[in-house]
Amino acid sequence: MVESIVEKCVEQVHNRFKLVLLASQRTHDLSTGASDPVEMVKFKDHKDTIVSLYEIAEKKVNTHELFNLLVKRCKEHMKGNTDNTYINSPSKLANLLNFSDHQLNTSLDVSQESHDDEIDDQDSGEEVPI
């Protein structure tokens, strides 16, 4: 049953990754009580994930609306996390913003030199431990 539902879902939402995101958003809506299943009687004993996939496969829910809800929820989550991180410690943000080009170039030069040494070791016939 689940395989046929997923196949029908892929016909509606061609990107499998987007399908997973949409199904998770719909499942979240059902689990939190934000909305009721479209056909409550038919899926009385089924898990919310199966109901979500069925609704997407049968076009019972608007996928554009689901996607917009998902984006909104992600933005709210990210806003909450970033505000807490940098409000409590403004020096962390200042350090990130004051990262100089010189520091970046120095770290790139060091990594390039170590890469060049590995190539030289390979040319000499010695095995390089990984």
From Swiss-Prot:
A Pfam family matched in the record: RNA_pol_Rpb6
Q: Which GO terms describe its cellular component?
A: DNA-directed RNA polymerase complex
Organism superkingdom: Bacteria
**The protein's Enzyme Commission number:** 2.7.7.6
In its UniProt record, which GO terms are filed under biological process? DNA-templated transcription
Renumbered to this chain, the Acidic residues biased-composition regions fall at 115-130
Query: InterPro entries, from UniProt?
Result: DNA-dir_RNA_pol_omega, Pol_omega/Rpo6/RPB6, RPB6/omega-like_sf
Keyword annotations: DNA-directed RNA polymerase, Nucleotidyltransferase, Transcription, Transferase
MF annotations from Gene Ontology:
DNA binding; DNA-directed RNA polymerase activity
Its UniProt entry gives the catalysed reaction(s) as: RNA(n) + a ribonucleoside 5'-triphosphate = RNA(n+1) + diphosphate
Which residue ranges are recorded for the region named Disordered?
107-130
Family per record: Belongs to the RNA polymerase subunit omega family.
- Assembly description: The RNAP catalytic core consists of 2 alpha, 1 beta, 1 beta' and 1 omega subunit. When a sigma factor is associated with the core the holoenzyme is formed, which can initiate transcription.
Q: Which PANTHER family match?
A: DNA-DIRECTED RNA POLYMERASE SUBUNIT OMEGA
Q: What does it do?
A: Promotes RNA polymerase assembly. Latches the N- and C-terminal regions of the beta' subunit thereby facilitating its interaction with the beta and alpha subunits.
Q: What is this protein called?
A: DNA-directed RNA polymerase subunit omega
Q: Which organism is it from?
A: Wolbachia pipientis subsp. Culex pipiens (strain wPip)
